[in-house]
Amino acid sequence: MSVGIVGGGLLGLGIANHLASAGVEVELYEADKRLGGLAGSTRIGGVAVDRYYHCVTTTDHKVVSLAESLGLSIRWRPLGVGFFHDGRRCSMSTPLEVLKFPGLRIDDKARLAAFVLACGRISDHEPLDELGIEEWARRKSGNRLWERLWAPLLDSKFDGRYDDLPATYLWSRMRRTAGTRDRKGREVMGAIEGGYQALVDRLAERIRAMGGRIHVNAPVRHIPASASGRALGVVTEGGLREHDVVVTTQLRPNLRGILDASFEEALGEDPLRYMGIVCLVARVKRSVSPYYAINITDRRVPITSVVETTHVVDPAWVDGHLIYVPKYVQSTSPDLARSSEDITEEFLGHVKALFPDFRRDDVIASQVARARVAEPVHVARVENRIPPVFAAPGLAVASSARVHPNIVHGQAIAGVAEHVAGEVIDRLPTFTSQRSAA
């Protein structure tokens, strides 16, 4: 019984780990020279760092358990969270600081607290999928909270287009952050020593030790279908490699041209849209921000946030301090094609606007990372939001789009990997017998 997995990010490796642990013959194909995908690393001034910012929360039980089973330690720290609102910087790290937030009246703050508590009491997300985010947020938390808080935050996260989002998105974010606070109300987050790349590398070692085969620099060119409509395997530069089941882990736009036309037809129209990201990562000599992350509701600063991960990551691990300046963009944004020099100059200017003590000569080294298709966006009122795992006999389609109703994070990806692997194990004997009969 052989399974081919297309994609060597956390999802593909997670599926491979579950399958190999169950005794399934696994072969994984990664187009890049390194495993990890969006969770992979890069080198900034000779030091390995996460390409994009990642953290672990106290509720990420699957990630914590996996890291510990691989012998990796996690460094936990209480964190500060800031806001940049109407040209002013303020802390929103504890409930008391929320009460002092200058952009809202006391009745707004009471409604905000009630809204967060209400989100925690809602367990069924399906009715929220049918409600627009603005309609629901205005009704539940009031017009002023929508206009002063939610709308500007969504604008920065979704590059101005959030009118089609379901209420589920805001509900999910509130539930994730509410369960990660200490007794003082501060968010607690963790960093894996060595970054997510260490998790990726150790996971790959485990898969190989169980007999799994992993190929890097091995882009899959095509997934062909038999005359009966069954997936035959994968076509790489070396030709066709047959498998009983093929599992893809890419988002739909990244599968175009790879799937047989019959598989594309079986999948039907994609109900999702996708966000890209442009992210400046810089190693700096000293701390830039008193916060782990700053939320920006003043849209005169057109970035999503400034994240100083060395409030969690030990500065000794990266020989300095580390800031990420992300901007989520539409997949057609011209920012995706701008030069790294232009992006660096502009984004560092925004950092200076938020933190006037920041000096350009504090930057040791920097790099701009981009991804045209980085995150799926689920919209309100659609059918077949999450299709069956198997799109056709022998073809399982998995991606980060399956995390819904959660937002995309390591814990949710680990859950998808476990679910998809379970489906493959349940149906693999059927596809194996079909292949033998053919």
Q: Where do the language-model regions lie?
A:
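Internal hydrophobic alpha-helix adjacent to the cofactor/substrate pocket in enzyme cavities
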Residues: 413-432
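N-terminal Rossmann-like FAD-binding beta1-loop-alpha1 element of flavoenzymes
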Residues: 2-28
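Glycine-rich FAD pyrophosphate-binding loop
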Residues: 20-44
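Mid-domain catalytic core of redox enzymes
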Residues: 22, 219-337, 341, 345-358, ...
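Active-site/ligand-binding neighborhood in enzyme catalytic cores
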Residues: 104, 113-223, 232, 249
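Short FAD-binding loop at a beta-strand-to-alpha-helix junction that anchors the flavin cofactor
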Residues: 322-324, 387-406, 412, 416
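Dinucleotide-binding Rossmann-like beta1-alpha1 core, especially the glycine-rich loop
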Residues: 45-127
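Conserved Rossmann-like nucleotide-cofactor binding loop
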Residues: 11, 34, 253
